[in-house]
Amino acid sequence: FDGRNAAVNERAPWMVVTATTNCCGYTGPACHPCLCTQSCG
C-alpha cells in the first residue's frame, strides 16, 4: 500500500489522493485526521 500511495501522491494532488484512499484507516503524509470527518475546510 505504501508504494502505491507514494506513486499516487507524487503524480496527483493531495485532494485526489484523499478521494482515492479515504484517509479513514490509512496513514500517509498527505492524510490529515480532519479528512476522516471531512471537517477540513
Curated annotation (Swiss-Prot):
It holds the Pfam family Toxin_8. Expressed by the venom duct. Contains 3 disulfide bonds. It is found in: Secreted. GO terms for molecular function: acetylcholine receptor inhibitor activity; ion channel regulator activity; toxin activity. Keywords: Amidation, Disulfide bond, Glycoprotein, Hydroxylation, Ion channel impairing toxin, Neurotoxin, Secreted, Toxin. InterPro entries: Conotoxin_a-typ. Residues 1-11 form a propeptide. Glycans are attached at residues 18, 20. The modification 4-hydroxyproline is found at residues 13, 29, 33. The modification Cysteine amide is found at residue 40. One of its GO terms (cellular component) is extracellular region. It comes from the Eukaryota. Signal peptide: none annotated. Belongs to the conotoxin A superfamily. Probable neurotoxin with ion channel inhibitor activity. The cysteine framework is IV (CC-C-C-C-C). This is Conotoxin Ac4.2.
